[in-house]
Every structure is written in structure tokens, then in C-alpha cells.
Curated annotation (Swiss-Prot):
Name used for this protein in its record: ATP-dependent dethiobiotin synthetase BioD
GO molecular function: ATP binding; dethiobiotin synthase activity; magnesium ion binding
CDD domains assigned to the protein according to its UniProt record, in alphabetical order: DTBS (cd03109)
Xref: Pfam families: AAA_26
Cofactors named for this entry: Mg(2+)
Active-site residues per Swiss-Prot or TrEMBL entry: 37
Compartments it resides in: Cytoplasm
One GO cellular component term noted in the UniProt record for this chain: cytosol
Reaction it catalyzes: (7R,8S)-7,8-diammoniononanoate + CO2 + ATP = (4R,5S)-dethiobiotin + ADP + phosphate + 3 H(+)
Amino acid sequence: MPALFVTGTGTDIGKTHVSCALIRALKVRGAVVDAFKPVVSGFDPKDAAGSDPARLAIALGDPSAVFRIAPRRYRAPLSPNIAAQLEGETLVLDDMVIDAVARAAELRDGLLLVEGAGGVMSPLTDTQTNLDMIVALGAPVLLVAGSYLGTISHVLTALVALRAAKVRVAAVVISESLDAPDLDQTAQALAPFLDGAPLFLAPRGESWDAGALADHLLAAVAPNAFGGTP
């Protein structure tokens, strides 16, 4: 399946920042790419333009695609299962997996970025986490982390969980956090522990060029992403 699951070591650490920059870089290279968020919480319908799905839609060049990108949207800024329950709904992992597989199939040889909610072990349903969805999809992972103090422990913990589940880690991205230690210094300290996982840095701001990350992923994950259907 031509999909890459974008997950993180936690919430609000830069997944969408990285996804948007990656989408732009892939499009510049002529690759066919799309984005899908199986579920999003903390979504304000009165301010949809400021949401993560809207940012992804803009990066794709289709600002109207917000609802297509994120079919399950809930208001409360809580874990998706709780946010859904507050609106009288129950999330079913199989439904989200089926939707993601269908979206990937529509692209044929393109690449679908599936952006999770929260971190690797964040709950999606009452009994299942993002890791369960990753395993069900069988997709490689792009692991995004912040550069704050303590991030090395969080990255290594996430990698232990992913590798124990036999998940392929395509790359690790350190997304620059506000008021954090030096980004390069954090990367240098982390690199020896990654056991071969490629490491990339994502400075803050829209000017970051994810070209090197895009080139790596096209070669490692989606070598046929130039022949899909947009």
C-alpha cells in the first residue's frame, strides 16, 4: 500500500508542520501525494481554516479539501475516543483502517500521508492506540519529535514500541520546539541511539525546505509515486 504513517512522540510537537513541508517538497518533485487524517479532535467548525486539516489542504493546493482529508472531526481537545463519545459517537478502528486503505488505493502509485492524532501510544478507541492502526495498515512510519529537553527519552521510548511491533521506521524528524535547546545539539546527542534510522531536522517556520526528507522517502518508501492519480 503506498502510504506513510506520520506519527509523533506526543501531541503538538510538529507533525502537521512536517507533513505540510513534505507535501510541498513532494509536489515540487512531481510526485503524486495526498493526505488523510483518520480522526481529529479539538476541531472548531467556526475556525476550520485554522485547523491541521486545513493546513494540509492548503499544502496540497486544495483549500476546500478539509472535510475530505479529515472525515471524523470532533470539537473537544481530548483524545479522539473521548471527544467522539461527547458527541454521541464511538470510534471503530477497523472503519478508520478501511478508509485509509481505500484512500491509498485511489492514488494507485502515489503516496498517501496518513497523519495520526497525538503520539504513537495515544488512544484512538477505548482499547486501541495509534500503534494498533499503524500495525493494521502495515505502513512504514515517519516519527516526528520536538527538540525540547527530554525529547531523546521520548523518541527512544517511541522507537522501542514501534520496533517491538515490527513497524518499519522510515525516518525520524526533530521538529524545532519553542525555547528549546539548540536543534543541532539535540540531533547530535540523539543520533547515536537511533540504530540506523535516518534523522532529519525541521526548523520552525514555513521557509523550511523538506527536500532532503522528500528525496529519502521517495527512494525508500514510494519509488513509484510519480505515476499515481491526483
